[in-house]
Amino acid sequence: MHRDLKPSNLLIDPEGKQLKIADFGLARTFGMPLKSYTHEVVTLWYRAPEVLLGSKIYGTGIDMWSVGTIFYEMAHKRPLFLGDSEVGQIFKIFKTLGTPTEESWQGFKDLPCMKMTFPQWKVQGNELLRKACTNFDEAGIDLLTQLVHLEPSRRISAKAALRHPYFDGFNPSQV
C-alpha cells in the first residue's frame, strides 16, 4: 500500500506517456490477514473515510479511494472533497455520498472517531456525486462511484478498475 497517493506524488514524463508513483515514505506491505497500521496517513483531501474515522486496520482500498479522488481532480481541476480538517473532510464525504448506515457499511459506527452525533445526510444513490461529475460520461461516473465507495470492501480493485468499460478503446500508444 502506498498510503499517500496524491497528485504531487504522481510524476508524468514530458511526453505524457509514462506515469510514475513517487514518495514511498508511508508505504507498507499488504498481506492477509490484515495488519494494524497507523491512521495518520494520506493527505487530507485524498484520505479514505475509514482512515478519517480512525481505523487502524485497512487495506488497499485506501489507495483506491485516493485514486478515485485524483481521477476526479484530473477531470475537473478541483478536489472532489475539499475539507479543512478531518471532521470537515468526513462531513464533505458524507454530504455527497450519504452518512453510512449499518446496512451500507457494517461496523462503521464502531470506528474510533465515528460519532453518532454527526449529521445524518441521506442521499439517493449517487445523485450528488453524479451532479459533481460534469466532465465524465456514464462510464467515468460509474468508475468513480466504484472507486469512492464508502464501504472499503466494496471498492473496485486496481485490476478490476483497469478492465472497467471507461478504458474500452483506450490505446496507450495514441496518448
What is each residue range found by the language model?
Residues 99-146:
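C-terminal lobe substrate-recognition/regulatory segment of protein kinase catalytic domains
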Residues 1-13:
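Catalytic-loop of the protein kinase fold
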Residues 37-51:
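Conserved activation segment of eukaryotic-like protein kinases, specifically the C-terminal portion
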Residues 153-175:
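Regulatory extensions flanking the kinase catalytic core
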Residues 20-23:
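Pre-DFG segment of protein kinase catalytic domains
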Residues 51-62:
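Conserved end of the kinase activation segment
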